[in-house]
Amino acid sequence: MRVEIDYKPAVPAGPLQAAEIQRAIDIVHQSGGGVVSIGPGRYIVTTIFLRSEVELHLQRGARIQAHHDLTSYPVLAATASNKDQSPYHLLVGQDCKNISLTGDGIIDGQDEAFWEPCGRVEDRPYGIFRFTVRGGSCGRPSPLVQFVRCKNLKLAGFTLVASPGWGLHIFDCDKVSVIGLTVRGHRYGPNTDGIGINGSRDVRISHCDVDTGDDAIILKATNPDSRCERVTVTNCVLASNCAALGLGADVCGLIRDVVFANCVVRRSLRMIQVEMWFSGRVERAIFTGITGRTLPDEGVENERPIYVDIQQFGRPDPELGQITDLVFRDILCESRGRIVLTAQDGSRIDGITLDTVVITVPEIEDPTVTVPRSPSLQLSNFNPETRSVRAAVVADNVHRLTLRNVEYRWPLGGSPTMHAFCCRNVTEFIDESPRLRSNPDQLNRIQFIGEQNANLYLPVQHQ
């Protein structure tokens, strides 16, 4: 069955327009399934619920726009405890099968309708503002589009813009396909993540273009019994003022069997990140064929082409997360920053391979200056001896580390001085990277901290 909806300017914006679309979706669902096609026009709506066996298709020229009045939205149960998640959403699919959201139309979250400026960044181009959520973190639809416990979910073609918080959140779903989405979020909005995959299985993301202020594509497992596994992210173009591609930091459950491949990063702060703030696990993740830069347009400090970290994050629970078997292969990045692989004492990263990783450095960011003055929690905060050390590659509490054909291309005459590698509590380390040199070359290539480094195979040594 196919239902066509034509935009009617006489219909008041908000709940009435949402009710029209909802009525069509429910009719198709009750008739056994089909397509609801939204024609060109601007639809200012509150929450719309997708149903099993129904495809909501947004034609080119259709714009689904979030109504600014949260009192018109239903209050929904949260899927996880997180300050960035509110009980309000624009499009929701919950406990559905064979559900689709497709088309060339636009989903518009009207971000600034829910924000207020909290300070001007005078040294940034164009006087860009930073924003905070008006009325507290729950005073916005976030995630804007959310799917919970759905099976056979297809998302294709549409554009998602101006989300007031998280953009697309896929929670505890199975057999998910995300193809050809365009996502645009404010660079200085509060937690404007692009695509979040949370505790979901058999997920394929491909050919997406994501440009956001917070993480572009991120995998999580926020509930202790959740599993985020068998996920591929391929052929995407990304930009972020945080992480372009990543796992964590909210991992209370398990993330495993993940591949990120053939992606281009226009700009980022951290091109690739794997973070553990809770006591979950990450196992078997591959990052391959990724090229780009960690040069944020607005000069955000503490760039890192690759960042892996385990920390307690101020929790009273002393149990720490686990990271096992990460591979970074065929990575090219222009960056001012370091590769940082750290774990808080009492934990360790077990099994990391960097193979054919080439970092071109236009100028060197001095971590002894930039790290101490940053309030960020994403700076190896529980590794005081290494978090600001001057070295291209920093490893702290790492077991089974292999560096093969890793290269840092320093700027001619660049300062400050940088060791090629710094290790603390590193065991079973294989160094096969003759082009990983210190700056200048006369400086000791490797800096050892502490007495717990052991079983180091170092055929490459200049100093």
Regions found by a protein language model. Name each.
Residues M1-Q463:
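Extracellular/periplasmic carbohydrate-active domains that bind, remodel
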